[in-house]
Structures are given as structure tokens and as C-alpha cells.
């Protein structure tokens, strides 16, 4: 009763059960049904909804700055809420570092590795693995022209090999072996259980109990995974500074040596999650959406093949100039956000203000992209895949496009967003340059039928490739 009527956040609208206990939210999260549940709540209550006793959800574009941006002149900023625990003796990664000053210091060390200049140096590496993907498909259809491929696996193989090379100085060999390594399988397992860990970290005694009483097999798997990361990073560091990868650009700075080895291990681990699965997710979802909308696919193919005379012209710089490709990426990120439930923020003890309304202290604030991007408050025809909405003069000028922030905003936004865009453009365009793609028969809606545990649980997306008819 206290939470419903007298809690500091009780003035905000929302379902009574969610105001009474956070179990309703965590039940939706742990069962993979949080995306449709959040959409239903915002459709019923509007753009501000209380989804747990101390958690408020927003779908307004103006809420981004109020929640996530740095506010000059204010003594206290919104803080991070939950964190992804690092696997190296609880040493925080850049993502999970609670201290703003330390986060900013570490982030500044990594920024040169994700600059335009650095990404230009890394373009040959991106091309190398996107070409390996093209050749893997070619070998398959040369052996059997009716062979079906799982596009989800193909994209994961490619993004993990790219990020493995950038992070560890060596590929993981997924494209070469056409299979996941045990280390990558462990990453996917951890992603699926992330929703359960959110519940655990919401109740302070539980993390200690889980850690103390976890089965020995789980603890061993954790230690093996951690040691694998440590060994790979250490091998890379022993190679020196002769490679244009992340560690070269970090350690070549005098202050870059201020990172401890445990900090390097923790950040390498988070790079391998944030820089792989998310990019592959967008590519998988966009491929499905294009194949389900053949007229959109045809327009994109014509733009790619009609803009260049040879494969050598498909550079990240040239591809960034293609307007319909950019529109497709934006619409793909809207329809299928790789991080559908982003990290929330918590107001300082003195409280804060969102959308002109005072929010009490120690209240969690979030903008769930899986709900915001499907709200008819923000988009006309929100359940339709319409890349044209991102182009001028197409009748979608009233869309509140500022809500689309797939990489967040503010001092803790995604440091690797430019790398992600380069990967997405290069991988997708090389496939569409070389191949015509066809969706294999399937039941249901591959996209909307998915469960979501922090990230989407993707089932196989089976497709066929044939050599492009140019």
C-alpha cells in the first residue's frame, strides 16, 4: 500500500501492480516479454509511465537530454543505475564505472581508437572480414546452389572476427571455421541471463548469495571465460604497438599507460559484447525487413550497384554518402533497436526534472527504445518498415525523429558508434553488391515474435544467396 499511495514516485501514472512491486517489471524482463509489455503500458498511460515503484519510463524525444545529457551548472548529475558486472574481480569497465571522473578519464584514453582517423586506418581490416564473408557464401553456393544460410550466424561470425582482431590483435576464426567458439557461446549465454541478473541486482542481498552458492560448474565456466579474455589481451600487449588497433592507439599515449591490466581486461570484455552482437543484430533485423519488403530492397540494391563502377569503390567514405542506405539503417535501428532496453539513470538525492516536471530523488529514469520507437506519439505507421520517412518530402515530416537515439546521448553514449556504422554499411553493401538474397519460407514474424532479455533472442534467419544479376 505504501508504494502505491505514498512512495515518492506515486504521482506518476502506471499499472497498480507495477507501482506496488518491481516483480511485475522483472517478471516481464526475465520471461522475455518486456518489449510488448512496455508498449502496452505506454499505449494505455501515455508518454510517462511508472513501471516499478521507483522507475519511470518515458517515450518523449525531449526526455533524452533531461535524463542522459550532462547538465552544466548543476552540482549533481543523474547517475548510472544498474551495471554490467565485469568478469575481472569486479573491476568496472568503462561502461560500468560508477565514478563519473574515472569514467571520463578512461573514456578519453579510448577515444583516439574510435576517431575518424583511426577508423580510416582500420578500414582494410573491416574489408578483410567482409570479403571473407562474401567468400564463405560463394564456397557454399558453389557446392550447392540451393544451400540455405543462417544470416544471424553469418553476421555474428563477421562482427566477432572484426572485433576480436581489433581487441585482441587476432581473429577468433569464426568465419574460417563456420562455427562459434566456446568463448563466444559463453557470451551468448551470459546475454540471455542478463535479465535475471537485473532482478538480482535490484535486491542487495541476492548478488552475494548467488555468488556464494552458484554451482561449481557455473563458477568454472566463469573462470575459464575470464582467463580466456585475460590471455588474449596479454598476448596482444606483448606484441607492442605496431598494429593500428585499439591498444596501439591507447598505449601510444603517455597517459594511456595509466590503465591497469585488470582495467584492460574488463574493457576488452565489454568491447566484445557491445561491438559485436549489437551490430550483428541490426544487420540481421535489417536483412529481414528488406527481404519482407522487396520494393525497398530493390531500391537499395539499385542505389548501391548504380553508384559505383567496381567493388573497390565500396569504401566507408563513399558508402556514407548514399541517402537511401542511410535511411534504411535509420529505419532498421527504429524497427529493431539492438539495445531495446538501455541503461537507466537515477536522479540525485535532491531530485531532478524531466519534461518540465519535478522528479523526486533516487528515482530511476529510462527510455525503452523498444516502446518509444513503436509509439504512434512519435511515428506515423510505427509498425511499418518505411525508410522513406527519413528522407525529405515523403509525407513523414511530422514524425518526432529526435526520439531515435540508438547509441544514447550524453557523456556515456556509445564510444564505438562510428565503427558500428562503418561495419554495417560495408558488410551489407558488399553482400548486396555480390549477391541477390531470398528469404526462405518460415512461419510467424521473425522480428516481432522474438523474446528479449536485455538483447533480442534471435532464432535462425534462413536465407538463400545467388550471384548478383547485374
UniProtKB/Swiss-Prot annotation:
Q: Which class of enzymes does this protein belong to?
A: oxidoreductase
Q: What family does this belong to? A: Belongs to the cytochrome P450 family.
EC number annotated for this UniProt entry: 1.-.-.-
Q: Name one GO biological process term.
A: fumonisin biosynthetic process
Keywords annotated in UniProt:
Heme, Iron, Metal-binding, Monooxygenase, Oxidoreductase
Superkingdom field: Eukaryota
What cofactor(s) does the depicted protein rely on?
Answer: heme
Q: What is this protein called?
A: Cytochrome P450 monooxygenase FUM2
Q: Name one Pfam family in it.
A: p450
Q: Sum up the protein's function in the record's words.
A: Cytochrome P450 monooxygenase; part of the gene cluster that mediates the biosynthesis of fumonisins B1 (FB1), B2 (FB2), B3 (FB3), and B4 (FB4), which are carcinogenic mycotoxins. The biosynthesis starts with the FUM1-catalyzed carbon chain assembly from one molecule of acetyl-CoA, eight molecules of malonyl-CoA, and two molecules of methionine (in S-adenosyl form).
Q: Name one GO molecular function term.
A: oxidoreductase activity, acting on paired donors, with incorporation or reduction of molecular oxygen
